Swiss-Prot record:
Keywords: Autocatalytic cleavage, Cytoplasm, Decarboxylase, Lyase, Pantothenate biosynthesis, Pyruvate, Schiff base, Zymogen
Keyword Cytoplasm: yes
Reactions that this protein is recorded to catalyse: L-aspartate + H(+) = beta-alanine + CO2
UniProt name for this protein: Aspartate 1-decarboxylase
Binding of substrate, residues: T57, G73, A74, A75
Localisation per UniProt entry: Cytoplasm
Pathway(s) of this molecule: Cofactor biosynthesis; (R)-pantothenate biosynthesis; beta-alanine from L-aspartate: step 1/1
Source organism (scientific name): Psychrobacter arcticus (strain DSM 17307 / VKM B-2377 / 273-4)
Gene3D superfamilies tied to this protein: 2.40.40.20
Major place of residence: cytoplasm
Primary gene name: panD
SUBUNIT field: Heterooctamer of four alpha and four beta subunits.
EC number: 4.1.1.11
């Protein structure tokens, strides 16, 4: 049996661009893309913390060090500039792989620089 598990995420990135007439995708600063382990053209889910919208598109590389998070094409309707988003990719693992795999978690500052990285999501407490 294959399990669909979190592969990586960019947590609390901010939308810097929305390009309605650009070919659909999400442009992600190349440094963030690499650090998270995202691949160009990889399917990503985006969760807009600001407005609650959730949608899927694919990742493309934006200029490294630019801090760009650009929602392109139809995805541009899903957020306003400055909205906080979580960008996730998932992968299929067999049960053995799933028991040892640790996702790459990248936590972003307000300017989309790296605040922290981790491989474990803390236990939620009351």
């Amino acid at each position: 049996m294959l399990l669909n598990m979190l592969k990586c995420k960019l947590h609390r990135a901010r939308v810097t661009h929305a390009e309605l007439h650009y070919e659909g995708s999400c442009g992600i600063d190349g440094d963030l893309l690499d650090l998270a382990g995202l691949r160009e053209n990889e399917s990503i889910d985006i969760y807009n913390v600001t407005n609650g919208k959730r949608f899927r598109t694919y990742a493309i590389r934006a200029e490294a060090g630019s801090g760009i998070i650009s929602l392109n094409g139809a995805a541009a309707h899903m957020a306003d500039l400055g909205d906080i988003v979580i960008i996730c990719a998932y992968a299929h693992f067999d049960e053995v792989e799933a028991s040892t795999y640790q996702p790459r978690l990248v936590y972003c500052n307000e300017d989309n620089t790296v605040k922290d990285t981790a491989n474990i999501i803390p236990v939620q407490v009351a």
